[in-house]
Each structure stands twice: as structure tokens, then as C-alpha cells.
Amino acid sequence: YNLALRSIAVVRQQERAAKEIAQVDSLPSKDVRHIGYFDITLPGLDGQEISLSDVANGHVTLLSFTSMDTDWSTAYQSQIASLYETYSPRGLRVYQVSFDTDSYVWKNRVVNQPWHNVRDKDGVYSSLIGLYNISSVPALFLINGDGDIVTRATSFDEVRGLLGRLL
């Protein structure tokens, strides 16, 4: 019963998002700034809202969807850290969305990370899963400085190759 209610809630969120997109499509083009991604605004560690558009504006950005409460999280975060250390001096930004429902686990795992970490408390019922067509986590997207999604990466080697060309 709860699963059905949550599924209905997710579908309704997706319908609302689709209506918002339709409204944006009807705006005069001079009032619209082109971006090739769905904007995300979620709370960070301090509770303040952080928007993907604020982080990515004019910068190459790695958009990461993940969960900290998994057996693979440590290795994954190590790979993100390696990319950040190598490419942030050249302008790379990282915006990481966690689908953890347990805020304690999430906060303890990201507290020392220097990039932008936000948490979607809806977990696997997040509307972002549908908007970004995420079938499993982790999921990586690379956004160029113009705001276009360059790739949905399947490996960190792919990301490194693209970052070498974009930065």
C-alpha cells in the first residue's frame, strides 16, 4: 500500500515537472537562458539550498548521482576525489546528489569532501530519477561550460578523456 502511494507521488511530481517544462517552452526566447539539463536545487550539509545552475554556470561540471550507504561508495568517492584533485584547478566543478534517506550516514560521509554535496531525502522516490532517466546509481553526467550535457558517462576513464579535452 505504501509503495503504491509513493509511486503515485513520484508520478505526480514527474507530471508537475513536465508541466513546468511546457510552461518554459512557451516563454519568449529572449527571456530564457538555454541549459541542457534539468536544474536541481537541494539542501547541502548546512541546510542551505544549492542549485546545480549556480554551480555549473559557465563551468565544466561533473553531475554525480549516488548513495553513501552502499558497499561501493568508498571506492566511488575515491574516484570522484581523484578527478576533483586533478581537474578542479583547471575549473572543474562537482555537484553530487545523494539519494540517502538517512541524513546521519550521508553527513558523516561527505563532511570532508570539498565539492558540492546535496541530499534528496526522497531517496529512490525522487523525481530526479525520472527526469535524468536513472536506472541505477552511481550515475555520472558531464556538463560543458555552455550548460549542455556532453555525456552520461559509463566509466571514470571516459570522464577523464572528456575532461582532458574540455578543460
What are these regions (language model features)?
Residues 74-111, 124-130:
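Structural microenvironment flanking redox-active thiols in thiol-disulfide oxidoreductases
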Residues 124-166:
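Thiol/disulfide oxidoreductase modules built on the thioredoxin-like
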Residues 43, 116-121, 153:
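Short acidic-hydrophobic, aromatic-tinged amphipathic segments that line or gate anion-handling sites
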Residues 51-80, 93-97:
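Short active-site neighborhood of thiol/selenol oxidoreductases, capturing the structured segment around
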Residues 50-51, 150:
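Generic structural signal for well-ordered beta-strand positions
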Residues 1-50:
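Oxidative protein folding and maturation machinery
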Residues 57-58, 89, 134-137:
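Active-site acidic short loop of glycosyltransferases
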